[in-house]
Amino acid sequence: MEKSTVYFTDFRCPVGTSQLDKLKKLCVAAGIKDIDMDGKFVAIKMHFGELGNMAFLRPNYAKVVADLCKEQGGMPFLTDCNTLYPGSRKNALEHLDCANLNGFNTITTGCQIIIGDGVRGTDEVEVPVVNGEYCKTALIGHAIMDADIFISLSHFKGHETTGFGGALKNIGMGCGSRAGKMQQHASGKPAINEEVCRGCRRCAKECGSDAITYVNKKAVIDYDKCKGCGRCIGACSYDAVYNPNSSANELLDRKMAEYAQAVCHGRPHFHIALVQDISPNCDCHGENDAPILPDIGMFASFDPVALDQACADACLKATPIENSQLGEHLAEPGWHCHHDHFKDSNPNIEWKATLDQAEKIGLGTREYELKIIK
């Protein structure tokens, strides 16, 4: 496969030019206007942020993309699917309330918001996964598959289970219905090392399923409630929470890549990622820790695999922020440095598996040429 082209612009803005201007220029340079959108539905997939989280992308960025689509005669809508775990986005009504409270509405974004898998998270389409090894079919939100054109607008940041969240996670996990998310997470559930557990209760606070209680000051998981989402693993600073299935995170990564392929296959797709507010964990949390790396810039490409690889490469070259989860880990005496910012922030991850699987099944390539837009 030939190298893909990824376009990049930084966040430096001379007087009279805004970040929104630069985002529009980036998208145009990357070829968004080459897509025939006239009279067609355009799904713009993004994350509206959990209530309490402040790291998610601002709605202003979404409006730039929506306006570009409308200029080309397209009919855009913002979309995301409901979450597997309880929170403010577990059904469409609460999800829409959450989006509105976080600033996403028709005025701020210039388009409608549609929750992809319906009121209860059960409005799904079973989509074949071409060349799938782990998933022969994927359960994708119905509204997302109804669109003629698919665009992902992703906040690139760290993630406690997948290493980072970029385009492939935004597409693969994000477009899965609640049952689709369960299928991806079904490779294993966490366990507690009682000898290491300090009873700090941080894992229980992060659990979205109310599945963790404490007995004799030690965490105990109720597996009837546990969804296997892995948030508790990222929450523990002492490695007391772990997945006994050593390959579970890698299996999740590979399934996620196959779900992304199911979403994109057979229709025009375009991808944008903003590498800013690089928190160590997912925007699904009701909080966001300090950024682990400085803001880097904006990327766009027709290839989501190359896009994620370019974002990851840029992050790996960046200097860690001292007062952050990553900086604190690197400063710990005896810390085993992985020379990988994502793995040093969240050691129990295998982020390269997602890109490897996505490339293997033909979604894109990890080889890219970076073109810089001033």
Feature map (PLM): residue ranges:
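Extended, low-polarity segments enriched in aliphatic/aromatic residues
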Residues: E2-Y61, E71-D80, Y85-K374
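Terminal amphipathic helices with adjacent charged low-complexity linkers/tails
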Residues: A66-D67
